[in-house]
């Protein structure tokens, strides 16, 4: 019996486990200490040392060998497009569920896949590999700004920046380099005009024959991250057919095996189109293709990894899988639209969630466990909470079903979401008319939020209960915390037993860092009888020394520079390298770089000044919360 190890986490791991179990396969999960909900769906579980192990080829293969896995499914992201992982599996007689290493060396490399397209007369945007900011500027002088810098191995919006002028190139190049695992980049002419839609073709191959499973449209994006996907596309068939033909031609040239997606940009006005890239793996949005073709794509992947199976034997052909109806996928993320879509970390209890249900509604999420546990949203992984997938006989029916699904969805936790954006999008007239391009959301965000907020006024009604219902020793881990939460506690003397207690009130007045129950620091405002109001610094006893040493910035103190978001410090200005400060920083200089969900955000100096002090906890590798004090400035010109 096949035994598959899934080298991934979250909803995609659960998706693969479910598909494998239905085929009678044994399953093995990898998990980390504070992220294990997906592992409850597997037969065997292996704990990793930390999130970085998901990117460690040697560690992943070692886990597969030790668990006696016959197959390895990489999911999406992480090492899913790694020819090194595929080769290592082959060397150790483990079946890699995906394309061959030879195919991956071309398909996962954006430059080599462009070269393949060019050799087959498939149009691409002007571009080249770049090793420096100067290379980008040289390209721009030939094709004119704007240009786009991309990581060769980027994805999910990571490793991508648009430059409108020369003075933006240096910082953009540096950030893309930091977000690229291979630290390899290329640049191309950016397609920023109105009307450009993102359309992708789903193919599946057995190494000899290739078929397509129609197209998906992914034009609803923000900062190159897909938010909503539909199938089929809103474009006329005459605009889609050349994309299908090109995808089939390229896949055939690669002798493609397993699932693959070929991405294109199409201008709905001019009908111009170009090839973008190949995603040689299962996509986040594979669900909408499954809905319109009534095909389990993940099971198809698993079956095609067995040498006896072919497309023909599995009855997989485009003629047999004609699209039926329309499907929409809405990505619910832990991002706060009111704060420029910053990650909203926090804890979610199972009882805080209510998912929509009914015919034609499907939920793929990691906020699900066979054992019941606290879910923690942190900075180590992406912000995706759930995928809400609907299917209807028509586009209008699918839209109405999506509206109902969002209306029924409840998340009563301190984690903010993009629900208002999803609601507002479906209410906007451009959604119904098909008038959405890849920059539409950025142009129309205010109106989208205006339409969406009334529909989500009751979406997050706050903490269901500040007091845990359980009285066991582990109950404290089920307390959901946010500023303003009031605790009613009974305090007993440690000196002698007592049958009486005095009631006091404690209010969590501010939070420096909250990825509770993993870490928490902030300020408690406490009212004691006869003593008035007393403020206490709050930190978990299990916190690291560096976390406990973090401080909150005072927004009213002009000398304080606070973190605008929650993230891991990956770079600090040399002037912040010591707690005593002393270095000079000019306005606009980068004082810190924070990594959030593998994307880097720059914190710039708001003014000229000298660093007078740096909190002891601020150092590379530490997770800081929104509002955490990064440095104290002083203006020596006044001395």
Language-model features: locations:
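ATP-dependent carboxylate activation and anion-phosphoryl transfer catalytic cores
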Residues: 6-27, 33, 42-47, 65-67, ...
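Conserved N-proximal alpha/beta basic substrate-recognition cap immediately N-terminal to
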Residues: 8, 51-122
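Conserved thiamine diphosphate
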Residues: 112-130, 160, 234-238
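Extreme N-terminal starter segment of soluble prokaryotic enzymes
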Residues: 1-3
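Short acidic loop-to-helix transition motifs that present clustered carboxylates
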Residues: 129-136, 168, 192-195, 568, ...
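Flexible, low-complexity "carrier/transfer arms" centered on conserved reactive residues
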Residues: 32, 337, 352, 422-423, ...
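Short, ordered loop/turn segments at secondary-structure junctions
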Residues: 9-10, 31-35, 50, 76-77, ...
């Amino acid at each position: 019996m096949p035994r598959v190890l899934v080298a991934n986490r979250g909803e995609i791991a659960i998706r693969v486990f479910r598909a494998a179990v239905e085929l009678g396969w044994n399953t093995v999960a990898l998990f980390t200490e504070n992220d294990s909900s997906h592992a409850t769906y597997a037969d065997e579980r292996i704990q990793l040392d930390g999130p970085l192990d998901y990117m460690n080829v040697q560690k992943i293969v070692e886990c597969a060998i030790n668990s006696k896995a016959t197959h390895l499914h990489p999911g999406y992201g992480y090492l899913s497009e790694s020819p090194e992982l595929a080769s290592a599996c082959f060397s150790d007689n483990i079946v890699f569920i995906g394309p061959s290493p030879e195919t991956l060396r071309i398909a996962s490399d954006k430059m080599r896949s462009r070269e393949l397209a060019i050799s087959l007369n498939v149009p691409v945007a002007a571009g080249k590999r770049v090793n420096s900011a100067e290379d980008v500027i040289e390209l721009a002088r030939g094709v004119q700004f704007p240009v786009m810098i991309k990581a060769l191995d980027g994805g999910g919006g990571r490793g991508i920046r648009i430059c409108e002028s020369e003075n933006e190139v240096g910082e953009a190049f540096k950030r893309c380099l930091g977000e690229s695992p291979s630290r390899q980049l290329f640049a191309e002419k950016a397609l920023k005009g109105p009307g450009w839609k993102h359309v992708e073709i789903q193919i599946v191959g057995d190494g000899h024959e290739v078929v397509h499973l129609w197209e998906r449209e992914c034009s609803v994006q923000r900062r190159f991250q897909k938010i909503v996907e539909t199938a089929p596309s809103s474009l006329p068939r005459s605009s889609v057919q050349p994309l299908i033909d090109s995808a089939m031609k390229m896949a055939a040239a690669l002798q493609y095996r397993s699932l693959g997606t070929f991405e294109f940009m199409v201008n709905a006005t001019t009908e111009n189109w170009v090839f973008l890239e190949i995603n040689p793996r299962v996509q986040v949005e594979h669900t909408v293709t499954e809905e319109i073709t009534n095909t389990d794509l993940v099971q198809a992947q698993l079956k095609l990894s067995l040498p006896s199976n072919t497309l023909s034997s599995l009855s997989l052909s485009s003629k047999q899988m004609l699209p039926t109806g329309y499907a929409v996928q809405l990505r619910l993320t832990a991002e706060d639209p009111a704060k420029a879509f910053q990650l909203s970390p926090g804890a979610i209890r199972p009882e805080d969630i209510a998912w929509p249900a009914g015919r034609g509604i499907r939920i793929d999420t990691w906020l699900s466990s066979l054992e019941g546990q606290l879910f923690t949203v942190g900075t180590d992984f992406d912000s995706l909470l759930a995928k809400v997938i609907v299917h209807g006989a028509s586009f209008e029916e699918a839209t109405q079903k999506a509206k109902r699904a969002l209306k029924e969805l409840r998340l009563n936790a301190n984690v903010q979401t993009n629900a208002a954006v999803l609601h507002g999008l479906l209410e906007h007239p451009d959604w119904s008319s098909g008038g959405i391009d890849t920059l539409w959301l950025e142009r129309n965000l205010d109106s989208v939020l205006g339409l969406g907020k009334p529909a989500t006024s009751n979406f997050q009604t706050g903490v269901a209960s500040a007091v845990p219902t359980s009285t066991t020793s582990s109950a404290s881990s089920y307390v959901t915390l946010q500023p303003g939460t009031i605790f009613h506690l009974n305090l007993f003397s440690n000196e002698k037993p007592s049958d009486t207690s005095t009631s006091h009130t404690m209010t969590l007045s501010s939070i420096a860092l909250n990825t509770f129950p993993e870490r928490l620091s902030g300020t408690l405002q406490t009212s004691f009888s006869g003593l008035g109001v007393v403020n206490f610094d709050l930190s978990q006893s299990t916190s690291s020394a560096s976390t406990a040493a973090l401080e909150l910035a005072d927004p009213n103190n002009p000398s304080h520079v606070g973190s605008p978001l929650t993230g891991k410090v990956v770079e600090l200005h040399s002037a912040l390298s010591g707690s005593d400060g002393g270095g000079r920083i000019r306005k606009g200089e980068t004082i810190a770089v924070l990594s959030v969900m593998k994307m880097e955000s720059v914190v710039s100096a708001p003014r000229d000044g000298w660093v007078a002090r740096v909190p002891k906890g601020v150092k590379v590798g530490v997770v800081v919360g929104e509002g955490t004090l990064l440095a104290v400035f002083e203006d020596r010109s006044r001395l």
